Amino acid sequence: AVDASKVKVRFELNSIPRNMIPDIEGLTRVLECCVDMSKEESEDTITMVKDAYKNCSRMNFHVLSCTDFGTKGMAGPYDHPHPFYTYMNSKGSSPGDPSRAGSHGHGKDAPLANSAVRTIFASSTYRNDEGEMTHMAQGKCVLMSHYQDDVMHENVGRWGAFNMTPVTDLESH
């Protein structure tokens, strides 16, 4: 933390209209492909995929927002080993002070496991090396490998800028 005496953490449960979820139609199409692909999978997998697909048609989504203030946050730039990149892309990797507590890079999947559509969005506002306020936002879903338009896709999908990096111009999205 920048100043531990001034750190604030806020948790809010919000109801968000379906049309406010970035690329919800794209996620719905991917889940439909996963439903088709899951037919040969275990009952647990079939149930999880069908439930996620069904949940994508909701008119409103419950979204848990976790916000912290007065910390170093998930700063960039968007490359290894910086915190935002590591949180959204790395497995078993946790940059930072070696004395800090935590699950050493494995706990970051917990929000995905608790999402009805196995999807998270993360955003960060931080001061870059030049002292300017910088913003990043990116989405991530972990589903299953699937075919879409006769092309095999991996189990991890991302929402972001054209090349699947974080969106930095928040006004345009």
How would you describe each model-predicted region?
Residues 6-9, 23-25, 99, 120-163:
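Flexible phosphate/Mg2+-sensing switch loops adjacent to catalytic phosphate-binding sites
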Residues 1-5, 19, 153-156, 163-173:
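N-terminal assembly/transducer modules of large multi-domain enzymes
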Residues 20-26, 71, 75:
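Short, solvent-exposed beta-strand-terminating loops
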Residues 78, 110-112, 144, 162-165:
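Basic, gly/Ser/Thr/Pro-rich low-complexity segments located predominantly at protein N termini
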Residues 28-33, 83-87, 141-143:
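Short, low-complexity, polar/charged sequence segments that are solvent-exposed and flexible
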Residues 1-19, 27-54, 107-112:
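Conserved ATP-binding N-box helix of the HATPase_c
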Residues 39-51, 158-173:
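A Trp-anchored, charged/polar loop motif used as the substrate-binding/catalytic surface
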Residues 42-131, 136:
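Flexible ATP-lid and adjacent glycine-rich G1/G2 motifs of the Bergerat
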